[in-house]
């Protein structure tokens, strides 16, 4: 860690209005200081560093030219919003990023009027901008609508759906394509810079004419470069021709780190555009901080780190992460079954499929930010005789739900869904919480839904999924490390729809689904100290339920409590349905279901979030005492 940077220009800026009086030279100083402040802040909190560093100059230019919050600046995904937050009245809290009670790591409407539209998932910004522009034309909020979207987010179909609609409506809307992957060769780059300056100096309606006429004005060595640039833009998917066919005037590419290019182009668009415009800027993720630029993911997400060295502060763990256990287990299964393949939607590292891809590159598919396509692609792989594992975060699987129903479940195709980040995920907060998958999957006919209680169970569930060819099967597991149990040498397929009793007891049964089992066992020990010895069981399956186990627990106990890391409508609701149909409640049987509360829980550590949700050991103990009518002890618990 180091002391905070010296930021004399940034110290003069509290809100975007303070930027308006700065000279272009001062804006360049502001950008340098903003980059240093962003690095310093994230070194304290951890977070998504690289994306923000890549848009520092763009952020300064946008707030210098546009009039937020009247003008709506919409940041796609939100990973890149830290510099924006510093310039919009939140610098004094920037070192609370992603901390409990602190700033969100994404844009959030309830946090600031400058966050006009919340984010967390990708590829939504253009739709929002088109919507804001339509509202303006119908008499709603005035001001421009500006979407800032990365080239990665452009791999999602939703972005092009929005471009198509925006071009059709023909309302003034500005899309800035933040391209941090392409590189333009020097001759072409020089040409692009020159043409961009010509564009900025001409009336907007004459942009195309200026571009055509510019060729003859260029120095002779540049003319061939100009022709090559024109052909290149026609041949690649991000070229201007595609966007113009969709109804957007195309400007660029320009250097997104050069304020001498950004400022005049944005000024011209602000002053003269009357219809949809797309500005293509080239940036570098992690710009200005060598450790981030050198990182494989260019500093996408980091823990706390030392500013001087870039060395991250990582907690020591005695157990492997669930993600790594999944990846290693899948590799073992694939070594003996050539039909096993893996599909991810732009998250190979996050899902562990980068490890699988290193071992089996021809059996690994990264489809981009396209969960809908990932699911249907996996369905066809299964129909074609393969055994696909579709590994997607719980929160992102929501984006492919229709395909799960229509293309997988109805056709009973054996797609294996590996659902990472199940339950509450900590610092990323509500947008990334895996709260709903059990509820929206378990109501589908013919699907198998499992949840691993620990890392050893996950190994067996990977083996179970690999061996299951009778229809779709899903297994969920959380973010973070396992609990440190002894690991099996090899996964053994579980009997479908069969749970297990962990420990025998009397009076009350605690039936866990997922990794709350560790907390359930702590609660059971506390209850035993009070003279109440509960039975503890691991359901393993939410669909199909272990009817025999559940009905036996009901028959031999006064009460049953289910515990899960999911929303209302999931495992506990299915257990209640079973008990009701079996007439168990007719004899006065006591049943309680502990689930995530019916609210979106703000970011914090996962431990604090589960305490807020009422799903830690003390809460389980208290619920057991209340259910048994031990009110005095329950109040003390």
From Swiss-Prot:
Protein name: 1-deoxy-D-xylulose-5-phosphate synthase 2
Gene3D superfamilies per UniProt: 3.40.50.920, 3.40.50.970
Residues bound to Mg(2+): 151, 180
Coiled-coil positions: none
EC number assigned by the record: 2.2.1.7
Job description of the protein: Catalyzes the acyloin condensation reaction between C atoms 2 and 3 of pyruvate and glyceraldehyde 3-phosphate to yield 1-deoxy-D-xylulose-5-phosphate (DXP).
Subunit organization: Homodimer.
GO biological process, one term: terpenoid biosynthetic process
Co-factor binding comment: Binds 1 Mg(2+) ion per subunit. Binds 1 thiamine pyrophosphate per subunit.
């Amino acid at each position: 860690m180091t002391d905070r940077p010296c930021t004399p220009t940034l110290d003069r800026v509290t809100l975007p209005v303070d930027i308006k009086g700065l000279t272009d030279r001062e804006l360049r100083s502001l950008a340098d200081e903003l980059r240093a402040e962003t690095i310093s802040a994230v070194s304290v909190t951890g977070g998504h560093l690289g994306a923000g560093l890549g848009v520092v100059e763009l952020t300064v230019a946008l707030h210098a030219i546009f009039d937020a919050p009247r003008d709506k600046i919409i940041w796609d995904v939100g990973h890149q919003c830290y510099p924006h937050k510093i310039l919009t009245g939140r610098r004094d809290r920037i070192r609370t990023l992603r901390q409990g009670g602190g700033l969100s790591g994404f844009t959030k409407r309830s946090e600031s009027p400058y966050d006009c539209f919340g984010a967390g998932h990708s590829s939504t910004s253009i739709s929002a901008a088109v919507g804001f522009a339509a509202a303006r034309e119908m008499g709603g909020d005035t001001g421009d609508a500006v979407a800032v979207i990365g080239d990665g987010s452009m791999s999602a179909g939703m972005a092009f759906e929005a471009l198509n609609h925006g071009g059709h409506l023909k309302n003034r809307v500005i899309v800035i394509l933040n391209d941090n992957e392409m590189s333009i060769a020097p001759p072409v780059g020089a040409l692009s810079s020159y043409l961009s300056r010509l564009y900025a100096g001409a009336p907007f309606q004459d942009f195309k004419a200026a571009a055509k006429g510019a060729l003859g004005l260029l120095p002779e060595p540049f003319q061939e470069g100009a022709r090559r640039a024109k052909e290149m833009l026609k041949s690649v998917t991000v070229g201007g021709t595609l966007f113009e066919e969709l109804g957007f005037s195309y400007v660029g590419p320009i250097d997104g780190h050069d304020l001498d290019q950004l400022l005049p182009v944005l000024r011209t668009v602000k002053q003269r555009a009357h219809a949809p415009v797309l500005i293509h800027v080239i940036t570098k993720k992690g710009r200005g901080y060598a450790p981030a630029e050198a990182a494989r993911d260019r500093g996408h997400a980091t823990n706390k780190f030392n500013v001087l060295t870039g060395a991250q502060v990582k907690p020591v763990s005695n157990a492997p992460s669930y993600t790594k256990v999944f990846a290693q287990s899948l590799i073992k299964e694939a070594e003996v079954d050539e039909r096993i393949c893996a599909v991810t939607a732009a998250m190979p590292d996050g899902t562990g499929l980068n490890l699988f891809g290193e071992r089996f590159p021809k059996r690994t598919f990264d489809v981009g930010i396209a969960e809908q396509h990932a699911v249907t692609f996996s369905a066809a792989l299964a129909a074609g005789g393969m055994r696909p594992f579709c590994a997607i975060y719980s929160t992102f699987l929501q984006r492919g739900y229709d395909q799960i129903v229509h293309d997988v479940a109805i056709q009973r195709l054996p797609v294996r869904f590996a659902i990472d980040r199940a339950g509450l995920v900590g610092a990323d907060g509500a947008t990334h919480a895996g709260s709903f998958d059990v509820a929206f999957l378990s109501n589908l006919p013919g699907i198998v839904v499992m949840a691993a209680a620990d890392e050893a169970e996950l190994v067996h569930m990977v083996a179970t999924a690999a061996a299951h060819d009778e229809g779709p099967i899903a297994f969920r597991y959380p973010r973070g490390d396992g609990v440190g149990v002894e690991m099996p040498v090899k996964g053994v397929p579980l009997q479908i729809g069969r749970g297990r009793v962990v420990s025998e007891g009397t009076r009350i049964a605690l039936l866990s689904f997922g990794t709350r089992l560790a907390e359930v066992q702590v609660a059971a020990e506390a209850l035993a100290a009070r003279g109440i010895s509960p039975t503890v069981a691991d359901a393993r399956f939410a669909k199909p339920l272990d009817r025999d186990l559940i009905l036996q627990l009901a028959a031999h106990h006064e009460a049953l409590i289910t515990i899960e890391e999911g929303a209302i409508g999931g495992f506990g609701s299915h257990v209640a349905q079973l008990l009701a149909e079996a007439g168990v409640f007719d004899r006065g049987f006591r049943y309680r279901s502990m689930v995530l509360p019916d609210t979106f829980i703000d970011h914090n550590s996962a431990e604090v979030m589960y305490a807020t949700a009422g799903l830690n050991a003390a809460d389980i103990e208290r619920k057991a005492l209340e259910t048994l009518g031990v009110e005095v002890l329950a109040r003390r618990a």
